[in-house]
Amino acid sequence: MKTDIEIAQSIELKPIVDVVEKLGISYDDLELYGKYKAKLSFDKIRAVESNPVGKLILVTAINPTPAGEGKSTLTIGLADALNKIGKKTMIAIREPSLGPVMGIKGGAAGGGYAQVLPMEDINLHFTGDMHAITTANNALSALIDNHLHQGNELGIDQRRILWKRVVDLNDRALRHVTVGLGGPLNGIPREDGFDITVASEIMAILCLATDIEDLKRRLANIVIGYRYDRTPVSVGDLQVEGALALILKDAIKPNLVQTIYGTPAFVHGGPFANIAHGCNSVLATTTALHLADYTVTEAGFGADLGAEKFLDIKTPNLPTSPDAVVIVATLRALKMNGGVAKDALTEENVEAVRAGFANLKRHVENIRKFGIPAVVAINEFVSDTEAEIAVLKELCASIDVPVELASVWADGAEGGVALAETVVKTIAENPANYKRLYDNDLSVQEKIEKIVTEIYRGSKVNFEKKSQTQIAQIVQNGWDKLPICMAKTQYSFSDNPNALGAPENFEITIRELVPKLGAGFIVALTGDVMTMPGLPKRPAALNMDVESDGTVLGLF
């Protein structure tokens, strides 16, 4: 079979104007970036707000292998299949970060015959949103350092500045840096560091803001650090929220592209789910709900991270809650969660599938806690065997969860028809009764304990001394009614990436709590989660190239 990029380059794209015409979007509603990419104007976004709200399908997954389990591929393939069976459907997904594209992933626009196109553009610079977010973030850093240099009227304690610079790359050498060296003309020396752009609070803000005014309000609320008297300093205190919003004025508008089968897709925003809330923009999802009868969206990593955050953080900002949740499972991930070594995942092992099913079962139970019906999608791989598939279907039947095999990677829309029909039937026969996991009025400790004990199934939460001090500070400043955004490994329910399957009786340690007032949540850091990833021993970048005619090589 052709590679992803060979498939993508073999497709004759339709002009984006023609793709979105069936949604009632005209040429005048678009801000074009060439023939195949566009942003949707705010005038059109506001015009469709009075339209009925369609059905929302959330795609999540079991705890993944390092290569991922194909959530984006399944999301795209399911939407194509829904359109194939006559359902007016849109996609709303995140845009890739260049760091992982150059690192381990090599691309993040779906795969096989379930891709959003033009995949080369989407995986690289797209419409420039990532660069705008990077620039806004670093402009704030420059303005903070300039304030210190020009007399520090606000009394900012340079030892307690929370705000870091960012770059959209995996670069471990930048995690800890010192700025302001070289004498009095070069600023005030202080410790600083870089995060990856998708970990920036500005990325989270962009994905939760509903318009320019809300964007400015959220930007003004960012806490950049503390004064010498330990009181917080915000972007509003610096009076630069307008300048930051100006940099982001186009980035906030959702991007429109198409799938291989011509399904219209919003690809907008890209926070990670292990260090942020892991969902595409509220604006894109909300607008899709007003334009289509069905919207298919996804949340990053496993359901313990992305789906929990989608349901507890993003959903309250949407006009509706998910009508169904599709949990993507692969036999290789089930076998890994069942104790099989990574180099043996392609070998048949029915007993490992049985053992790893405990992981999938827990995710199904967790989704049901939110009052939403679950459907399991088996993302088919060539190494899957009939015996393994049969036992997984048998196990799903034992907990009364619908399950369908999906071959959208190899077969495109046709390979997702059975899944699409099952999802539509599930929505029709099992109306959702959404409820959040916790009430925001609970204490910070109680909210974290709810997530740990009810979603992860841990037995206890330990708060390190630093986090205890930060909780007291959060309460003192009146921030304790915000939801919690857990920063945790994606590979395990616990904070230990090696504790696979469905671990029990484990304790989770909270080492730090970071207020993200602009985004509207508090990040609870566990384990060794890094906000600036590093590159692997053999980065995907080593296989990338561009030919003299501009043809891109090596993305996948």
UniProtKB/Swiss-Prot annotation:
Transmembrane segments: none annotated. ATP binds at residues 65-72. The keyword Mitochondrion does not apply. GO terms for molecular function: ATP binding; formate-tetrahydrofolate ligase activity. Keywords: ATP-binding, Ligase, Nucleotide-binding, One-carbon metabolism. It comes from the Bacteria. Pathway: One-carbon metabolism; tetrahydrofolate interconversion. Pfam families: FTHFS. It catalyses: (6S)-5,6,7,8-tetrahydrofolate + formate + ATP = (6R)-10-formyltetrahydrofolate + ADP + phosphate. Gene3D superfamilies: Domain 2, N(10)-formyltetrahydrofolate synthetase, Formyltetrahydrofolate synthetase, domain 3, P-loop containing nucleotide triphosphate hydrolases. InterPro entries: Formate_THF_ligase, Formate_THF_ligase_CS, P-loop_NTPase. It is an enzyme of class 6 (ligase). Its EC number is 6.3.4.3. CDD domains: FTHFS. One of its GO terms (biological process) is tetrahydrofolate interconversion. The keyword Nucleus does not apply. Belongs to the formate--tetrahydrofolate ligase family. This is Formate--tetrahydrofolate ligase. The lineage of its organism: Bacteria, Bacillati, Bacillota, Bacilli, Lactobacillales.
